[in-house]
From Swiss-Prot:
One MF annotation (Gene Ontology) recorded for this entry: protein tyrosine kinase activity
Keywords: Capsule biogenesis/degradation, Cell inner membrane, Cell membrane, Membrane, Polysaccharide transport, Sugar transport, Transmembrane, Transmembrane helix, Transport
Name used for this protein in its record: Capsule polysaccharide export inner-membrane protein CtrB
Role: May form an ATP-driven capsule polysaccharide export apparatus, in association with the CtrC and CtrD proteins.
Annotated family: Belongs to the BexC/CtrB/KpsE family.
One cellular component (GO) term of this entry: plasma membrane
GO BP annotations, alphabetical order: polysaccharide transport
TM ranges: 32-52, 358-378
Keyword Plastid appears in the UniProt entry: no
InterPro entries: Bact_polysacc_biosynth/exp, BexC_CtrB_KpsE_VexD
Subcellular location: Cell inner membrane
Membrane topology according to the record: Multi-pass membrane protein
Domain of life: Bacteria
Amino acid sequence: MSEQLPVAVATETKAERKKPKKKSWIKKLSPLFWVTVIIPTVISLVYFGFFASDRFTSQSSFVVRSPKSQSSLNGLGAILQGTGFARAQDDIYTVQEYMQSRSALDALRKKMPIRDFYEKEGDIFSRFNGFGLRGEDEAFYQYYRDKVSIHFDSVSGISNLSVTSFNAGESQKINDALLKQGEVLINQLNERARQDTIRYAQEVVNSAEEQVKEASVQLTKFRVSNGIFDLKAQSDVQMGLVSKLQDELIVIQTQLDQVKAVTPENPQIPGLIAREKSLRKEISQQMKAISGGGEGSLSNQAAEYQRVYLENELAEKQLAAAMTSLESAKAEADRQQLYLEVISQPNKPDLAYEPNRLYNIVATFVIGLIVYGIVVLLSASIREHKN
């Protein structure tokens, strides 16, 4: 019995050696899980934990306003006010579009090395052209648009400008420069509207002056050709002359009747008769000149004279109205129609809210799990379909 014990012990030892060892949980993970979950999460952890650069956002708010008190303009002035200037609510979109435009970027380049701010700072994945593959100006413009954002509140009319960069001071500097450029744009819009308004008003005045000149020339020609300078005064003169001639005719007729009654053979009678005929002829001619049917009569000339005279007066009144509107337009245009009012100045952030490191790491892990689950389900479905 004692000789069989070593054999039994040896057999038991061999059996224990043949038992498989338990694998660690890491080794139990499938390669797919490593590829879709673990490796991306580790990369995200390393990048956001040690390499990702802080990004600072400077914020400011502004509003584009127009003066509340608008001077009242009549006639042409109201038309000029309507056509010369847009509402401030419309121009805010112009300012917003400009701040994200190539023109604004070009203006920033003249004031500061804005490309160096984004190309020479930050980690290789965050900065512009980190791998040296796309250094074109158009590529930088698209990068710039991602770093400048504007939100407009249509209820309050306030716009919020946000600028993000890798340095707090640089973000503040860019934000401040954009606000100043927006104010320059508003001034340019005001000046352009001012020039358009005054130019249009001046054109109206010039047109009215031409009408006055033309009407004045027509009136002068009529007066010279017809010998009439003041129809009413000239008519009064002629009527007065007729009245005097009629009075003289009455006197001559009275004398003639008296002489015939006293001395029918008086030698003065032929002279008085001749004088009577002359007066009657003169009165007849004067009456024809006033109301006769000839073209030269005052009655026929009165209608044409009145038309030419009224055209001249109307042209002068239109010129006076145009001059008044021009002065009103100049006074209105000299006032600043629109202005950019900064509500809050660009701040210098002392805390970087981007990148959100924990959120990005967790998001990478969750997305990896989702991808892993989808791939596993697809693989199982394919295997089941084959079987």
